Amino acid sequence: MSKIIGAVEIGTSKAKALVGEVTENGSLSIVGMASRPNEGMRKGEIVDFRKAADAVHASLEEAEKMSGTTVDSVYLAQTGTHLRGEMLSGSASVSSSENRVSASDLTRAAKEAKHKEHEEGRSYVHHIRTPILLDGNPVEDPVGMFGKKIDLSYWSVDGDNQAIRQALHVITNYAGLDVADLILSSIASSTMMAGPDLRRAGTLVIDLGAGVTDLSLYRQGFVAYTGVIPVGGDHLTGDLSMGLRVLEPYAEKLKIEHGKASPDASDADEVVWIIGNKTIGDRSIPRKAISDVIHVRIVELFEIISKELGALLDPDELKGGILLTGGGSKLPGIENVASKVLGMPVRKAAFAPGIDPQLATPENATVLGLLHYGLEDHGRPIGDKDDEPTPGFFGKLAGMVGIS
């Protein structure tokens, strides 16, 4: 029997909803998808609840209409500069007199790693496990093996309760749905755009959104870092509006139709016309001026990323290179600027074969990744046997942030 599941991304520029059907063998088909402009967000966080909620509700309704079905719960993306990550570690001595590892030994090490108290007003969103060590050697599953000590770590991300509550409230109270899980936008998009082989080789995925840029870095197949940079495509629009003295709608049009990450020789002689109105009239702008403004902000963004990651930007550890996705990755030449600033090979991420070409666009990486994340082995795969919905992690989170 197939199972219907949903995904929602409350993005800075658009709210997106997706409906998927999971078959008994675990395959996923996208049966409905819709998006609506979202004027209730700024830098990945809700600033006008009603506008954000209306955009989500409209996109969900349209996606359900397209699919011919309804959803009861959704996977919800979470981003924003309020999110913070750190590596938490724990260890446990093997309790058996024979030094044979048991499941309880592993549980004790995990509890120690997760024991750290978060600050008041904050809650953990993700605990993402990194390699397990048995007597200092990495192992996939130590249970049943012989050794003396288990060490493990989690990349743990916490967030501001108020920001989390707002996002949950849009789904649970306004849309009347359950949240199956809250997933970092960076993890969702990297799950979609960087397959297991790339993650094992080591890769950095940079998701260039409208309000923020999400980062996820993998080493040896495991998450080693996630982060959110408060710079996105809207900043380019704002820069063009101020620098060229045009209204933001015109600036957005200039960015999309004529923008480049860096100017080239041909731009010096090319002129772009803005068809104005009775107030401003028509105007001509050198294309080089557009590229110059964009270039400054793009360089600044990648310089911030370079400073943020520091020693983590190690070519020997990131043999899979750096991938760009998100709507901002469509900017011509952006991979070349990124490579020059970061000092590593950078390319635009490509979707795996089999994704509907109409859906396989960079700006859809996160919402598609929400469902594909659940299909991978992250403790509770989508379409698994009909277990009772897990109240554990998410139930505790909802309780802590005041959602019943």
Give the ranges of each region predicted by the language model.
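Extended, folded domain segments that form the structural surfaces/walls around functional sites
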Residues: 9, 195, 207, 300, ...
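Glycine-rich phosphate-binding loop of actin/hexokinase-like ATP-binding domains
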Residues: 201-243
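Glycine-rich phosphate-binding loops at beta-strand->alpha-helix junctions
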Residues: 159-160, 260-262, 317-341
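Conserved phosphate-binding/catalytic loops in two-lobed NTP-binding clefts
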Residues: 103-104, 341-368
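Core structural elements
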Residues: 78-81, 210, 326-327
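Hydrophobic alpha-helical bundle architecture
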Residues: 307-327, 341, 347-353
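Acidic-glycine-rich active-site phosphate/pyrophosphate-binding loop
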Residues: 29-30, 207-212, 216, 335-351
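Nucleotide/phosphate-binding catalytic cleft detector across ATP-hydrolyzing
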Residues: 1-14, 18-205, 222-223, 233, ...
